[in-house]
Amino acid sequence: EDVETIALDNVAFEVKDGEFVAIMGPSGCGKSTLLNILGLLDNPTSGTYLLGDCDVSQLRERDRTNVRKGEIGFVFQSFNLIDELTVAENIELPLTYLNMKAGERKERVQQIMKRMAISHRAHHFPHQLSGGQQQRVAIARAVVFGPKLILADEPTGNLDSKNGAEVMQLLTELNQEGTTIVMVTHNEHDALMAQRTIRLFDGKIVEE
């Protein structure tokens, strides 16, 4: 007999344009499921998800993919860089999906590498970088195409405190420039950098 597991139960909240929101809660409470739905990697079985004015929960798969590639940037705990590509190539990757001319792609990559203080690593491969440098590359890749929304899943989880603080500073600066950020974290100190915190427990919001 199949037993239905409810990962998220009547979760309702609004993130305003330009806000920085942290999501906290114990392992297994639904944080990753929520982030996957926000990132259009999973579909909710019921309910709606409005991204701007569009109910993206009703889109066809191809349209969802286009929205994801054009409007949402992802930052992961494990960086998720492609080992065979250089730093510059990793950062350029999202731009190749947007029919952007090569010259403009290169210029954008140069600008964001300078911003993230990794220009001197442009031709290095991920395994030649420290954890902090890899996360800077991952953030550069996430923002290079100017997404409306950044989803960060434990962005400092694999970093020491110094590199973690630098990554949080970068995210805070991006938010101050107008980027909307939703961040899942176990770290209370990181959560304090957000404007508000949503706490999940057993698939429900217990505090907002």
Report each predicted region and the residues it spans:
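ABC family nucleotide-binding domain
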Residues: 1-197
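H-loop (His-switch) and adjacent beta-strand-loop-beta switch element
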Residues: 197-208
